[in-house]
Amino acid sequence: MQAKKRYILVFVSCAFLAYAYFGGYRLKVSPLRPRRAQHESAKDGGVQPHEQLPSFLGAHDMQELQLLQSNQSKSLDSSKHLVTRKPDCRMETCFDFTRCYDRFLVYIYPPEPLNSLGAAPPTSANYQKILTAIQESRYYTSDPTAACLFVLGIDTLDRDSLSEDYVRNVPSRLARLPYWNNGRNHIIFNLYSGTWPDYAENSLGFDAGEAILAKASMGVLQLRHGFDVSIPLFHKQFPLRAGATGTVQSNNFPANKKYLLAFKGKRYVHGIGSETRNSLFHLHNGRDMVLVTTCRHGKSWRELQDNRCDEDNREYDRYDYETLLQNSTFCLVPRGRRLGSFRFLEALQAGCIPVLLSNAWVLPFESKIDWKQAAIWADERLLLQVPDIVRSIPAERIFALRQQTQVLWERYFGSIEKIVFTTFEIIRERLPDYPVRSSLVWNSSPGALLTLPTFADSSRYMPFLLNSMGAEPRHNYTAVIYVQIGAALGPNAALYKLVRTITKSQFVERILVLWAADRPLPLKKRWPPTSHIPLHVISLGGSTRSQGAGPTSQTTEGRPSISQRFLPYDEIQTDAVLSLDEDAILNTDELDFAYTVWRDFPERIVGYPARAHFWDDSKNAWGYTSKWTNYYSIVLTGAAFYHRYYNYLYTNWLSLLLLKTVQQSSNCEDILMNLLVSHVTRKPPIKVTQRKGYKDRETGRSPWNDPDHFIQRQSCLNTFAAVFGYMPLIRSNLRMDPMLYRDPVSNLRKKYRQIELVGS
């Protein structure tokens, strides 16, 4: 009995000590914790709530988070009565992928009918440019059942209720749209949201629901990552297409220009956005740092001006804005009333490296573009550190940053069309079955818009990425002969001689003959023997066939078009394509030499017949000439090498208006191919040797003998330039010849001896 009491006493004592230790410790670490919270924690296994867990954020990160949360709470308080979108949208929850399985097409709602007063809802110039860019592109469809994306016919760019472009009654207009479905698969473009005095970022004045927002001045707490798209802010005069190219003409040493850092703009003596700009005078020294502001804007600036306004205005008038842009190494891009600024795009175009002073701003297309390669970040709260930041950047990085500003401007930001198409491609890459381009493709020239991932599984097959990836084009070439006249095939015929010459080349892999002539295909026995070289003959739609025609022949359907010579035929398996007219008179050495030159420049057109373009002041139009001058900008594809990717791009990327122009004229396809390649590479073609003529004059009738043929080509050139929005062709005076070409040495020392026998 005594032993039993002792055991009970020991057990009770241990239980009391355990309760005193563990219970007292929990009361000590959370003395103010509510009983209900303690009970819930006990049910969860004693896990502490996240508010009481230790933070691993640094002091700087904690300050940044507090600043963002305070700004967000102010914005929400100012517009808490507005529900502008579904906040938790993702592509998986707010987007119908089944609409996009076949093709990525965009439908635009038709304009609203006139109201009782005979007036239509207003549409701003910029929104009309967006609609025009889509309607004239390959994305557009007039069939809503085939569309993947829907674009509103209602102008939503400016949602500032004080603006003249503000469209009223948007909620009721959205309710009348037949395919609205709470915004699913819709995209809404917006540049300005909110109004004076708080300019709330999420104040659109309507519920966007599940629609994707393509919006300027987006903050990190407002952006639905992986769903919305941040776009740049652009002004009312921004061009629809192409527009001005980057203004950096050279990237020479020294890297620093006259001014190290510059800014010229207005400051706000009251209201949001005034804190940073009102302090910029501390950085201005008038020597290498020029940061000037003015108070002269708005209706009540005189009543609200502060003591510095007069001095700031005098200093402001001393400097020209364009001069500062062109002569500054860095350009400050502070936030204004909203996070974004026009100066961002202006600095990119001028090659003035942007120094961003806008905390929490999500940069345009940030999910794809690596902005560390083109911009510098600064902190609004650490304004006085900006001079030290820009002075610490080495010259080699300044070179790289400046170069990247030009790449991004020309490929993504130079026009409204490029901004809209980039937005579409970002959304397109979110689709489950569409291949995703690498960061290298997005952040190097020519950019993602001109790199179609459906062409090949790997980027190494793109001609302009071979050097950066340390790769070489695949060996050998495919000769493609376009037959338009179809003269009788015999040993003395130009086509017969051409096929025989090609078979002697050491680099040819296959010969493809495109028969577009009205005459029937020659019999198989009339073609020259090609030994081990496969010969394929394709009869283009509309031409006739004879029994047993062609060595390996097939027929396409429909009316033949001259653009069919640039179709991506399955028979073309090599990277190099040798494009030839049926009456070309080149020898084997000329073919081999041109191919070896092309292997060093696989992104360009390399060939023999050269032409030039020029600006005709008397006609205020572009001119085209075949005269022998000291420069050229076109190498005709009647005797030239190029990469097969350009066939794919020509067929699947070019505007349908351009292809229609070629088809209607049955001419100019070679000029269009030159414009395309120059647009992609921003480089001229390459002419080899001094050969001028390349056609057999005994062939007979030829479209080149038609006097209207030349006039037609000038008209085509101007049409192409108008559709591109600028003139892509680039002049060159470079010509490549073989080693010892025309030198007074023995012919036995020369590799390409037949070239020596060719006259001019």
Swiss-Prot record:
Cytoplasmic compartment residues: 1-6
Disruption-associated phenotype: According to some authors ttv mutants have no effect on wg signaling, while according to others wg signaling is affected. Such discrepancy may be explained by the fact that the absence of ttv could be partially compensated by the intact sotv protein.
Entry cofactors: Mn(2+)
An annotated GO cellular component: Golgi apparatus
Region feature (Disordered): 540-560
Localisation per UniProt entry: Endoplasmic reticulum membrane; Golgi apparatus membrane
Effect upon mutating G447D: In ttv205; induces defects in wing patterning due to impaired movement of morphogens
Described function: Glycosyltransferase required for the biosynthesis of heparan-sulfate and responsible for the alternating addition of beta-1-4-linked glucuronic acid (GlcA) and alpha-1-4-linked N-acetylglucosamine (GlcNAc) units to nascent heparan sulfate chains. Botv is the trigger of heparan sulfate chain initiation and polymerization takes place by a complex of ttv and sotv. Plays a central role in the diffusion of morphogens hedgehog (hh), wingless (wg) and decapentaplegic (dpp) via its role in heparan sulfate proteoglycans (HSPGs) biosynthesis which are required for movement of hh, dpp and wg morphogens.
Name of the featured protein: Exostosin-1
Species, as recorded: Drosophila melanogaster (Fruit fly)
